[in-house]
Curated annotation (Swiss-Prot):
GO terms for biological process: biotin biosynthetic process. This is 6-carboxyhexanoate--CoA ligase. Its cofactor is Mg(2+). It comes from the Archaea. The gene is bioW. Signal peptide: none annotated. Keywords: ATP-binding, Biotin biosynthesis, Ligase, Magnesium, Nucleotide-binding. Disulfide bonds: none annotated. Belongs to the BioW family. Pfam families: BioW (PF03744). The keyword Nucleotide-binding applies. InterPro entries: BioW. Coiled coil: none annotated.
Length: 256
């Protein structure tokens, strides 16, 4: 008998629910067979209550069945590890990588500045025109939330990262997320760094590669964010900005 697939989503906050002004602490998403759910629920709960940003007083867990006929399978990005010795070097490298991937210098600078200017972490992503650097979504501080994403085989995925000497929850989740983003039509590149205060590593995602950059912010900085650079010339009546956002927010994608 074929086992059903389920989406598990967790979000936690301190000071009440997010909708009532609670401060976001952590979140997670998994797509699992029904026989994997019980064990992973424990892991997700532990993540919620042990996060470095504090212990939440609100934890929301959501479990939904998935229609397997609607799942898309996409390839994983290649990991390229870079070396830098300072935040300034890291940001300079990020800008260069973005420019090499058809983002204008003006838009690359605006993308970096957009994250640096945040007073609190944006929940989703900001969408910028790759040429002008102008923000093209209207989601405000919520941003565009990328959901419906997981590894097609989490055990094999973790084993492959371990063989490459690249273990760690941040990398596991970021690489899967970046791979879905790269598969989205009209998005040419992504810039991201974490809001976890002690985690200063960030990345530039392109259509083929995940460029891991060791330092993109100061240690102790609790603000992070992500920017997607969009080739607006690919948007038209048959593929609109709304279609692009729907793919990111709603389409179930498993990464192979």
């Amino acid at each position: 008998m074929k086992l059903m697939m389920y989406s598990i989503k967790m979000r936690s906050a301190k000071g009440g629910p997010h909708e009532e002004g609670g401060k976001h602490i952590s979140g997670a998403e998994r797509i699992l067979r029904e026989d994997e759910i019980e064990e992973e629920l424990i892991n997700v709960y532990r993540r919620a209550i042990t996060h470095e940003k504090g212990k939440p007083d609100f934890i929301n867990l959501k479990i939904e069945a998935i229609d397997e006929d609607k799942i898309l399978y996409k390839k994983r990005l290649n990991i390229i590890q870079h070396k830098v010795s300072s935040k300034e070097e890291g940001l300079k490298l990020a800008k260069e990588l973005l420019i090499k991937n058809t983002v204008s210098e003006e838009a690359a600078k605006e993308g970096i500045s957009s994250i640096q200017k945040l007073k609190e972490s944006i929940h989703g992503a900001m969408l910028l025109d790759k040429d002008s650097g102008k923000r093209i979504d209207d989601k405000g501080i919520k941003g565009v939330r990328v959901t419906g994403i997981a590894s097609a085989d989490i055990k094999k995925y973790k084993e492959s990262l371990k063989r490459d000497g690249r273990e760690g929850l941040h990398l596991e989740e970021a690489l899967i997320l970046a791979s879905k983003i790269a598969s989205c039509k009209a998005i040419v590149a992504e810039l991201c760094w974490s809001d976890d205060p002690s985690y200063v590593i960030g990345y530039v995602g392109t259509k083929e590669n995940y460029h891991r950059i060791p330092i993109l912010k100061d240690k102790g900085n609790p603000v992070g964010g992500r920017v997607f650079f969009v080739d607006t010339s690919q948007l038209n009546d048959n593929y609109t900005l709304e279609d692009l956002i729907d793919y990111l927010e709603k389409q179930i994608v498993l990464i192979e």
